[in-house]
Structures are given as structure tokens and as C-alpha cells.
Amino acid sequence: MNHINHIKILLMEELQINNLETDIFLALMKSEKTTSFGMQENLNLPPDQIIEIAKSLETKGMVIEINKNEFRALHPRFAIVNRYRRICEVNNIPFKKNTKIDNLGIMLENYQNQV
């Protein structure tokens, strides 16, 4: 399994996001900011679907909409911890240090620095 597939699996398992959310989050990490049309080329999804998924990621605390239909991923470590905190709140689990989450944040930061 290659590195990016490992990251995708961890994102889906640990942060309870689906495959399309994972693809869009990683696409946003590749660029400082982008529109749905900017992501459309790489994802083969209609712009409306990309916007819907990006807004879902925004409610999960992982991205922000900086202009109409223009999104940016939060810093990898912040996005991961933010999402983990929300999962803990919803499931009434105490929020505490989680090595898997911390390591996932580091892996994403390294991924972002490589692209």
C-alpha cells in the first residue's frame, strides 16, 4: 500500500469521513486555496458536488470557505485535532491525547509539504 492510500484509510477510519471527503480534503491540502472548478479537473466530479462535500468538511471543522465557493484546508494538525474533538463531543467521549490522531496530523503535514 502506498503512502497516500495509507493516509486516506486513516482519515476515513479515524476521522469518520468518506472517500469523497478524503479526496477533496487532500486536494485542498495540495493548493493554498481553490474553487470547485479548480478541483474539478483532478476529481472528475461536478462543481456542485464538490461544493457540497467541501461544505460538509467545513461543518466537520477541517476546511473553511474563504470566498463564495472558494475553500482552503486548515493546517493539517489543526484540521485533524479539530475533527477528532468534534467526534469526541458527538460520542460523549473525553477529549484527550490520541497518538494515532497526532501521528496522522504529522503525516498530513509531511504530505502537504511534499506537494
Residue ranges and their predicted role:
Residues E21-L28:
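Short alpha-helical "packing" element that flanks the helix-turn-helix/winged-helix DNA-binding module
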Residues L11-E21, T35, E65-C88:
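Short, cationic-aromatic polyanion-contact patches
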Residues A27, N42, K97-N98:
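Short acidic/histidine-centered micro-motifs embedded in hydrophobic/aromatic stretches
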Residues N44-T59:
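Short amphipathic alpha-helical interaction segments
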Residues E32-N42:
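Short acidic, hydrophobic short linear motifs in intrinsically disordered regions
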Residues M1-E14:
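Short, Lys/Arg-enriched N-terminal segment that forms or immediately precedes the first helix
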Residues R83-V115:
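Amphipathic alpha-helical dimerization/coiled-coil segments
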